[in-house]
Design a protein with these regions (language model features):
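DNA polymerase processivity clamps
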Residues: 2-200
Length: 200
């Protein structure tokens, strides 16, 4: 929030005594404090990615509008992607988990999955910009090994790698519709992204 916007809200509250204005001001200041703390502690990338998920306009499920704690890890999902982290990131948390994510995190044999090349943040941003300039409705990032073509929403992939640019990306060999997994060597951040169906 800017100093000008804060001043205007205080003036409006003084004039109307509308508690909704004061509540909005408090929420805005709390958000600013969280962002400052994240930046100071070097956690802004994970926080930014989680906020991209909980703030997804396509996310129509209210219970996924905020993150929650799962086994001590901050977790967020929107039906397309999920991020869970053990890092102490300052984001808004709800009290109860809206869904049991344990089945998504256990028993899939991550180490046995096939590794995909991890694109750079710069390459993803360039792809999004080029597709937008060409008037495309959305942007798809495609891995093609000659036998399997796997496509994902480029913006969602960018969000996942914003949380951890050096994550290893793995997939079920030969399955273009199975979930794609992201992991870092220290297991601080773990993610899942669903692919987009495209013509073979």
């Amino acid at each position: 929030m800017t100093k000008t916007s804060i001043l205007e809200m205080v003036k409006e509250y003084t004039k109307t005594q509308d508690l909704r204005i004061m509540n909005d001001l408090i929420r805005g200041l709390e958000e600013d404090i969280r962002n400052e703390n994240n930046k100071a502690n070097g956690k802004s990338n994970v926080a930014k990615a989680i906020k991209a998920i909980t703030g997804n306009k396509e996310n129509i499920r209210d219970q996924f509008k905020t993150a929650w704690l799962h086994n001590g890890r901050i977790t967020a999902l929107d039906g397309y992607r999920m991020i869970t982290t053990s890092e102490p990131v300052n984001v808004e948390l709800q009290d109860n988990a809206p869904i049991n994510v344990t089945p998504f995190l256990e028993g899939f044999g991550y180490a046995t999955l096939e590794e995909l090349e991890t694109p750079s943040i710069g390459d993803l941003k360039t792809k999004i910009a080029m597709d937008k300039a060409e008037g495309k409705k959305g942007s798809l990032w495609i891995w093609d090994d000659g036998s399997t073509r796997i496509a994902v929403n480029t913006k969602y992939l960018l969000d996942m790698l914003t949380a951890d640019p050096f994550a290893t990306i793995r997939m079920t060999a030969g399955n273009a519709t199975a979930a794609i997994y992201f992991n870092d060597p220290d297991a601080l951040v773990f993610g899942i992204l669903l692919p987009v169906r495209i013509a073979k």
